[in-house]
Amino acid sequence: MAVKRAPSKKPRPVEGRKPKKNPLFAAKIEHVDYKDINLLRTFISDRGKIRSRRVTGLTPQQQRQVAVAVKNAREMALLPFTSR
């Protein structure tokens, strides 16, 4: 038997969410370079994890480029693997 839930108190927006701004399109960057540490730090959380597409607003291709660039920068010791 299913239990009926009370309706949520907060009404949902009717029009939906507006898409996030793409930071790479805004900066007119076509290729992500692993040596551009300031750019890569915007896509890394304070714990050292790569942020998801939902958070960053990147396209799938750009997200893959960022992930590869971050991993290369970590191997070259330009970025830490974790933050303490």
UniProtKB/Swiss-Prot annotation:
Residues 1-21 are annotated as: Disordered. Part of the 30S ribosomal subunit. Forms a tight heterodimer with protein bS6. The gene is rpsR2. Binds as a heterodimer with protein bS6 to the central domain of the 16S rRNA, where it helps stabilize the platform of the 30S subunit. GO terms for biological process: translation. Gene3D superfamilies: Ribosomal protein S18 (4.10.640.10). One of its GO terms (molecular function) is small ribosomal subunit rRNA binding. Coiled coil: none annotated. HAMAP family: Ribosomal_bS18 (MF_00270). Residues 1-11 have a biased composition (Basic residues). InterPro entries: Ribosomal_bS18, Ribosomal_bS18_CS, Ribosomal_bS18_sf. PANTHER family: 30S RIBOSOMAL PROTEIN S18, SMALL RIBOSOMAL SUBUNIT PROTEIN BS18M. Belongs to the bacterial ribosomal protein bS18 family. GO terms for cellular component: cytosolic small ribosomal subunit. This is Small ribosomal subunit protein bS18B. Keywords: Ribonucleoprotein, Ribosomal protein, RNA-binding, rRNA-binding.
